[in-house]
Amino acid sequence: ATLTVPTTVPSVSEDCEQLRKAFSGWGTNEGLIIDILGHRNAEQRNLIRKTYAETYGEDLLKALDKELSNDFERLVLLWALDPAERDALLANEATKRWTSSNQVLMEIACTRSANQLLHARQAYHARYKKSLEEDVAHHTTGDFHKLLLPLVSSYRYEGEEVNMTLAKTEAKLLHEKISNKAYSDDDVIRVLATRSKAQINATLNHYKNEYGNDINKDLKADPKDEFLALLRSTVKCLVYPEKYFEKVLRLAINRRGTDEGALTRVVCTRAEVDLKVIADEYQRRNSVPLTRAIVKDTHGDYEKLLLVLAGHVEN
């Protein structure tokens, strides 16, 4: 994780008082908001929201929404949410968008632990009064539907135990299906959607040793095929999440005009998880530190909070 929380944190009521102060008077004190929320973990932020509502009779998110704008507002609001609520919100937005939405749904389904995904589904129920599964079922079609529905519905085994005989059998099965271009075959999807990450890793290692190619190389038959691209991303998310997120960041930062949506999503969903590993991968791949790339591509309070969440320490 890259989030830094001070060893001694002020009391929750003090944090709330300071936030209230940041909203009062002429203009908003964005620096104060960054100093407080940018250095509190999920549990602390939840407590701040609860206490703020009890003390001032107003939802902190509504107060922030009124005071802030643009990319900075989006980053603060997403960051202030509980991780499960945030995933529910991102997933719900994804079911309403036609572009890149499949990727966001797959990312949430494959890079969260079994319990995190379960909590996201529960948060979805609470927030939208329906299930994530029914929205995904309703908004996706064809092969995308076939892959995404079992992915968002899954509850994978999390242990390290691996069945090597099964890994061998399923590597052979995957190789046969892929050789026959049966990419959306039930068996391919079953393996990716139900097996534990450790088991999938063993299967894919066996695949490479036995058939000479990384599975994602064999899934590159048609670079323009969007389903194949999603399948490759699924494999990456399950086995090398840091490589997947590095690529999302690289594409977000390197395009003409930054994709702030993707940059915001990755930084605020991974800052408490593995953003350090992702940043190391980014530097290895691009020979530039992630924080420097952020400085070059963003500005103002948005840039400041991104840097704080990415663990940047000002000298």
UniProtKB/Swiss-Prot annotation:
Ca(2+) 1 binds at F23, G25, G27, E67. Pfam families: Annexin. Ca(2+) 3 binds at V295, T298, E303. GO terms for cellular component: cytoplasm; exocytic vesicle; membrane; plasma membrane. InterPro entries: Annexin (IPR001464), Annexin_repeat (IPR018502), Annexin_repeat_CS (IPR018252), Annexin_sf (IPR037104), AnnexinD_plant (IPR009118). It is found in: Membrane. Ca(2+) 2 binds at I253, R255, G257, D297. Annexin repeats lie at residues 10-81, 82-153, 165-236, 240-311. GO terms for molecular function: calcium ion binding; calcium-dependent phospholipid binding; phosphatidylserine binding. Its main location: membrane. Keywords: Annexin, Calcium, Calcium/phospholipid-binding, Membrane, Metal-binding, Repeat. Monomer. Trimer. Oligomerization is calcium-independent. Disassembly of the oligomers seems to be required for calcium-binding. Binds to phospholipid vesicles in a calcium-dependent manner in vitro. Prefers phosphatidyl-serine containing membranes. May have a role in the membrane cytoskeleton scaffolding or exocytotic processes. May be involved in oxidative stress response. This is Annexin Gh1. The gene is AnnGh1.
